[in-house]
A protein has these predicted regions:
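N-terminal start-of-chain detector that recognizes signal peptides
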Residues: 15-20, 59-62, 96-98
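Terminal interaction module
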Residues: 18, 116-200
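A glycine-rich, hydrophobic loop/mini-helix early in the fold
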Residues: 33-88, 94
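Charge-rich, low-complexity segments
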Residues: 1-55, 166-200
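Conserved NTP-handling cores and scaffolds of large molecular machines
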Residues: 11, 66-70, 112
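Core of folded catalytic or high-affinity ligand/protein-binding domains
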Residues: 72-130
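A short linear-motif detector with a strong N-terminal bias
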Residues: 22-27, 66-69, 101-105
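Generic structural motif recognizing short loop/turn segments at the entrances and edges of beta-strands
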Residues: 2-3, 14-20, 25-27, 39-45, ...
Length: 200
């Protein structure tokens, strides 16, 4: 950044730091203790769909790499497209196998980034679920979203019932609980709703 950037109030964009994803397992322990949320075992990487053989090759390689994991149980890695035209590469692991799920997400992001598709990466999300509301737990679902281009996390908690409403109170409680574990996105207007994301 130069002097002119400082005078005009411009800021330098934060470089993505994919290693921040590895803080999720310890953050999950905090979430369970603070707001009774546990991992669902589902995580996904969202990217803008690109047409072309090069991108298809990378996508196939990443999928084959993750499916080759001998320890993987359950369904293979899948690719879903949402109503907005974005693609989600979805990995499913056991609910207590969060470190392996995080490694999957890191591998997908790293592969796309190293092959020149970093600008297409949007976010990664790991799903969590709460206990029944009647027992004093959080209830419902929550996604911890990693914004690739900002290098930050934020919580997204859609309310059950099919409407497009979010549980803002739960999101703020999660932000407070994880302040020491994750780099939380400070600008609330960047806490984009990811309606229909896999695992939520």
């Amino acid at each position: 950044m130069g002097l002119l950037d400082i005078i005009l109030g411009r800021t330098k964009p934060v470089a993505p730091d994919l290693d921040r994803l590895f803080a999720l397992p310890s953050a999950a322990v905090t979430l369970e203790a603070a707001v009774s949320l546990t991992p669902t075992g589902t995580g996904a990487v969202c990217f803008a769909t690109v047409e072309g053989a090069a991108f298809d090759d990378v996508r196939r390689e990443v999928r084959a790499l993750l499916d080759a994991d001998a320890a993987r149980t359950g369904p293979p890695v899948g690719i879903e497209r949402d109503e907005y035209g974005y693609s989600w590469l979805v990995s499913r692991r056991g609910p207590r196998d969060l470190p392996a799920l995080v490694s999957d997400l890191h591998a997908v992001n790293s592969a796309l980034e190293s092959d020149g598709f970093g600008p297409q990466l949007l976010c990664s999300v790991v799903g969590f679920r709460g206990e029944d509301e009647g027992e004093g737990g959080a209830g419902g679902r929550l996604g911890l979203v990693y914004l690739y281009k900002r290098g930050t996390f934020y919580p997204f908690a859609p309310l059950p019932g099919g409407g497009r409403r979010r549980d803002s109170a739960l999101e703020l409680r999660v932000r407070a609980a994880l302040a020491d574990d994750l780099r939380i996105e400070p600008e609330l207007d960047r806490w984009f709703p990811i309606w229909g994301a896999p695992g939520l």
